[in-house]
Amino acid sequence: MNPRRKKRLGIVLAIFIGISATIGLMLYALNQNMDLFYTPTELVNGKPDGTKPEVGQRLRIGGMVVVGSVRRDPNSLKVSFDLHDVGPKVTITYEGILPDLFREGQGIVAQGVLKDATTVEAFEVLAKHDEEYMPPEIAEAMKKTHEPLQYSSEQKQGSGE
């Protein structure tokens, strides 16, 4: 092999290794930043396909705030509350100001890190902003586990429909 071909081969190999390393690092970063959505039941029992989150994994969890479960620390902005759907309850801990629409019995989505099998340390809490609106992930999960609500004509009339 002449020196010119060796040099060209070295350049091509260096470019190939550089591109491969870049793609590998991008895939690693995307995998680390992926937040999977769970309901409280899926978090405790696992998803139907068998996946279950590991302690330390970032995730999103959605459900209804259990009435009477909100506990506030009087000396800080720390709040903890329980979430449920149709199964087990999951405790959410959060430090910060909760959204104005946050209430017991209301639907929320929390984004955070799984601390143990039934505790999530949230760094973001989002409250439902409309009676009719529900995030697509929660709507899909609720559709699987709940019967649709049937409203009487008086109830529909009272809601302005």
Swiss-Prot record:
Gene Ontology CC terms, in alphabetical order: plasma membrane
Listed PANTHER family: CYTOCHROME C-TYPE BIOGENESIS PROTEIN CCME HOMOLOG, MITOCHONDRIAL (PTHR34128:SF2)
Subcellular location: Cell inner membrane
Native species: Vibrio parahaemolyticus serotype O3:K6 (strain RIMD 2210633)
Keywords, ordered alphabetically: Cell inner membrane, Cell membrane, Cytochrome c-type biogenesis, Heme, Iron, Membrane, Metal-binding, Signal-anchor, Transmembrane, Transmembrane helix
Annotated spans, Disordered: 142-161
Family: Belongs to the CcmE/CycJ family.
The name this protein goes by in its record: Cytochrome c-type biogenesis protein CcmE
Record function comment: Heme chaperone required for the biogenesis of c-type cytochromes. Transiently binds heme delivered by CcmC and transfers the heme to apo-cytochromes in a process facilitated by CcmF and CcmH.
